[in-house]
Design a protein with these regions (language model features):
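Gram-negative (and chloroplast) outer-membrane scaffold detector with strong preference
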Residues: 62-158, 162-164, 184-190
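Compositionally biased regions
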Residues: 3-6, 17, 156, 186, ...
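Short N-terminal segments immediately surrounding and downstream of signal-peptide cleavage
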Residues: 36-53
Length: 192
């Protein structure tokens, strides 16, 4: 009888070992998938040609993830408010962007994308009706650097991009002005 129970124990140990090896293999395969995306809250600084030399602060949130090796896709949302033309015009913008970034190394990325830019121009000291809202599609080009803070968990993300929107037209003065701008953002990319 002890030979039969030894065979059962040996078979149970063998099955346990195979199950442990399969679980370990599955865990090793799933680790890259589990960290496939990042959520990136950020603060940015924007410089517009008609911003009176001022730098506007913006706030953003992005989701970024790999789509194929060395290529990441990103969806982003941001918000900024600034004064233009000697404080005569208050501009509020909330762009929604989609970007593709080529990552030749894990630390650097370059690329660009498209965005939907909702812009409201308000004229202070006038009725609330004295505002003009427009929606434009624009393109952006840029790049960035990521530096690990806590490997596999969080990294610092520094991004620079040029946004091309062309001429902004308003029914209120100024009738036309250049809407392009440079923006730099610093964020923390949290992996999930």
């Amino acid at each position: 009888m002890s030979g039969v129970s030894n065979n059962k124990v040996a078979r149970m140990l063998e099955r346990s070992l195979v199950a442990a090896l399969l679980a370990t293999g599955l865990a090793l395969v799933m680790v890259p998938v589990a960290k496939a995306g990042q959520i990136i809250p950020s603060v940015g600084w924007t410089k517009t040609p008609d911003g009176d030399g001022e730098t506007a602060v913006s706030y953003g949130l992005a989701l970024r993830g790999g789509i194929v090796p060395m290529v990441d896709a990103e969806l982003g949302f941001s918000y900024r408010k600034e004064k233009l033309f000697d404080n005569q015009v208050e501009s509020t913008q909330w762009p929604v962007t989609a970007s593709v970034w080529v990552t030749p190394t894990p630390m650097f990325y370059v690329g660009g994308g498209l965005g939907w830019y909702n812009t409201t121009l308000h004229y202070p000291n006038t009725p609330a009706l004295a505002s003009y809202t427009s929606q434009k599609t624009g393109v952006h080009l840029g790049g960035g650097i990521t530096m690990p803070l806590v490997p596999g968990v969080a990294s610092a993300d520094l991004n620079l991009r040029y946004v091309y929107l062309g001429e902004e037209k308003s029914e209120l003065p100024p009738a036309n002005f250049k809407a392009d701008y440079w923006t730099t953002s610093l964020g923390i990319a949290f992996s999930f």
